[in-house]
UniProtKB/Swiss-Prot annotation:
NCBIfam families: hisD (TIGR00069). Disulfide bonds: none annotated. It catalyses: L-histidinol + 2 NAD(+) + H2O = L-histidine + 2 NADH + 3 H(+). Keywords: Amino-acid biosynthesis, Histidine biosynthesis, Metal-binding, NAD, Oxidoreductase, Zinc. It comes from Sulfolobus acidocaldarius (strain ATCC 33909 / DSM 639 / JCM 8929 / NBRC 15157 / NCIMB 11770). Pfam families: Histidinol_dh. GO terms for cellular component: cytoplasm. Catalyzes the sequential NAD-dependent oxidations of L-histidinol to L-histidinaldehyde and then to L-histidine. Its cofactor is Zn(2+). Gene3D superfamilies: 1.20.5.1300, Nitrogenase molybdenum iron protein domain. Its EC number is 1.1.1.23. The keyword Oxidoreductase applies. This is Histidinol dehydrogenase.
Length: 393
């Protein structure tokens, strides 16, 4: 079904499940492992003897060679991307004061890997690799127990995951946020998930850092007459695979492309939107206003338009399919949705690093010192002024 009018807001209905999720969080906080075992039996239909996966080596040894080779190759690609984004130590000096920033990794990180019809090893790679490259010392992973297979185990072993927990849903987020007898309390939780996972991340965010609250998948395709309509259609279908609430928009200057897309996609069950524009500059204005998760620049000379993009989670240039970013290009597939790309980007090493600033007053300018004292006194902080003055008078 096609729609020409873009909705002003995107679907985000996790508020409906907040009361239930809050009950789950409270159960885990109050009763720890016992609550987790009961909740796993209730929601994941898993009667567990242990919340910790103890068969990682055994399972990892059973990975088929073709998947092992694929994981190894993708691992190298993702590591290379994230290594190129590591910050340099920043330092300088002015008015007799040395100053700078030290980058330090978060100590303990929890990763949620969702379950569904299949396991999602790509999400484990996308979340754990930037954490390891950033220098995180302890990484703990939670995923539904029926989704721990040889591929997940192989990645966990390769990335030296400290523990793999057999827990799904809101109860997994609660366990990572507050800790239990078996589950380590972490400093930050990252990873995608369903409406219950997102609601739980929202609720625990007052107690533990999170990467963000993510909604359904989003794709904006900007295309001109040079775009291969078959590839455009495939990209739109690919993102629609994430579910019926996927938010998919074609913004184009081409009537031919509109006709071809409609001819194919009007048969589909998912909803999509088309915006006809007069120029690619106008299309970019539309995309910047939407601030999508994925943005595809399917135009002639796409790099020449990059400087005009202000809001997007990840950008696919030319023939590059967004699906390649989802798996192996290098950038992360854990991306902001629901217009959050206005203020933040996809998962990077910076999500696992914190800047610590320092100053060393070697021979500070006397006038600067006196001005600091003056402002301290103006604000009513007399001992701030005295503390400064005692050093330099």
């Amino acid at each position: 079904m096609i729609k020409y009018e873009i909705p002003k807001s995107r679907p985000n209905e996790f508020s409906k499940v907040l009361p239930l999720v809050e009950q789950i969080l409270n159960q885990v906080k109050e009763r720890g492992d016992k609550a987790l075992l009961e909740l796993e039996e209730k929601y994941d239909k898993a009667k567990l003897d242990s919340l910790v996966e103890n068969r990682i080596d055994e399972l990892a040894s059973k990975i088929p060679e073709e998947y092992k080779a694929a994981i190894d190759r993708i691992y190298d690609q993702l590591v290379e991307f994230h290594k190129t984004t590591l910050p340099y130590m920043v330092g300088g000096g002015y008015n007799g004061i040395e100053f700078g920033i030290l980058w330090r990794a978060i100590e303990k990180v929890g990763i949620y890997v969702p379950g569904g019809l299949k396991s999602y090893p790509s999400t484990l790679l996308m979340a754990a690799i930037p954490a390891r490259v950033a220098g995180v010392s302890e990484i703990y992973v939670a995923t539904p127990p029926n989704r721990i297979d040889s591929v997940i185990a192989y990645i966990a072993k390769k990335l030296k995951i400290n523990a793999l927990y057999r827990i799904g849903g809101a109860q997994a987020i609660a366990a990572l946020a507050y800790g239990t007898e078996s589950v380590k309390k972490v400093d930050k939780i990252v990873g995608p998930g369903n409406i219950f996972v997102q609601a739980s991340k929202f609720l625990v965010s007052k107690d533990v850092a999170i990467d963000g609250i993510e909604g359904p998948t989003e794709l904006v395709v900007i295309a001109d007459s040079s775009a291969d309509y078959r590839h455009v259609i495939l990209d739109m279908r690919a993102q629609a695979e994430h579910g019926s609430t996927s938010y998919i928009i074609l913004v184009t200057t081409s009537d031919f492309l509109i006709d071809k897309v409609r001819e194919e996609l009007d048969k589909e069950e998912f909803t999509y939107y088309i915006v006809k524009v007069k120029s690619i500059d106008e299309a970019i204005d539309v995309a910047n206003d939407i601030a999508p998760e994925h943005l595809s620049l399917f135009v002639n000379d796409p790099k020449s338009y990059l400087h005009k993009i202000k809001n997007a989670g990840a950008i696919s240039l030319g023939k590059t399919p967004p699906a390649l970013i989802d798996y192996a290009a290098g950038p992360d597939h854990i991306l902001p949705t629901n217009a959050w790309s206005r203020v933040r980007g996809g998962l990077t090493v910076y999500d696992f690093l914190k800047p610590i600033s320092y100053a060393n007053s070697v021979n500070p300018d006397k006038e600067l010192v006196n001005m600091a004292k003056l402002i301290a006194e103006y604000e009513g902080f007399i001992y701030h002024s005295k503390s400064i003055g005692a050093r330099y008078e």
